């Protein structure tokens, strides 16, 4: 997790939120990610969120692109936590420091929704006694929102042409080779092979464009039955099936210790895909690419978890290790069949 820099005193934080007319007495730390610090605060009667990106992590121009995309989505009916301009008229502010370098500050409004991971339907409210297992409206809405974003990508352009690209596969493979023990060198090779296959996929406006890049439950709210999106830090140019596959992978991992893993996995995928299909069609070629992306994400997860020691990393590593082979049991699902599936949940 990101470490708060020594220069970020209460006074310095006051000066930063002051760019958005923030009230110092209302500031609350909201946590951190690998490269960001998050703070909530009030300004002119609204709750807002400051995202402070640490020096060297993102080019400010790329952050400008990120939030141009967020604004574009909002202008076209997608619920996304919208940025606010500073009193200088800027969407993105650069905070210079003579020793630690420049940090990048962005402020968005705070969602009024409920985090998806805390909603009644997530894993798996619809299966509670007295509910209709056919419904799963949040899963369908999740898929529908994904498809709507992908449809909108075709019409989006930024002043710089959106320069942020997908992960650097060769660099990740080299990292895996460096950090894993020699006995696990096949893992790095699997990562390289998956990336090489991914790079051979077609690139056109029907399959490739700006994607969220981390469209998982952890980055979504439920707001009056609609999906509201935040954390666009991983948005980039990529394949739309990448977005779909990361959603599926993260949910499969969340289900990995459930008694009826397969039944609930199929339930989720079929409902998510049902929602996606209501807005945008996928052909069999792209559905057949889902297992490739799942293997890629799984290998990445294994490498990342091998560098951590907390209990959550242990769960991730266990799931990833069990599915490193080409015959990964967790991914042995009929994605084409689930895409067109209309039936109910058969689990108990």
Model segments located where?
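ATP-binding pocket architecture of kinase catalytic cores
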Residues: 43-156
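Active-site catalytic-loop/activation-segment of kinase and kinase-like phosphoryl-transfer enzymes
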Residues: 2, 161-201
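Conserved NTP-binding catalytic cores of kinases and kinase-like/nucleotidyltransferase enzymes
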Residues: 1-91, 98, 224-226, 340-348
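Active-site activation/catalytic loop segments of kinase-like enzymes and analogous catalytic loops
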Residues: 241-280, 295-311
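ATP/Mg2+ or Mg2+-diphosphate-binding catalytic cores
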Residues: 301-348
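Active-site acidic catalytic loop and adjacent metal/ATP-binding pocket
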Residues: 34-45, 49-50, 83, 196-242, ...
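All-alpha amphipathic helical-bundle segments outside canonical DNA-binding/catalytic cores
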Residues: 137, 141, 282-294
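Short Pro/Gly-enriched beta-strand edge/turn motifs at strand-loop
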Residues: 18-25, 193-204
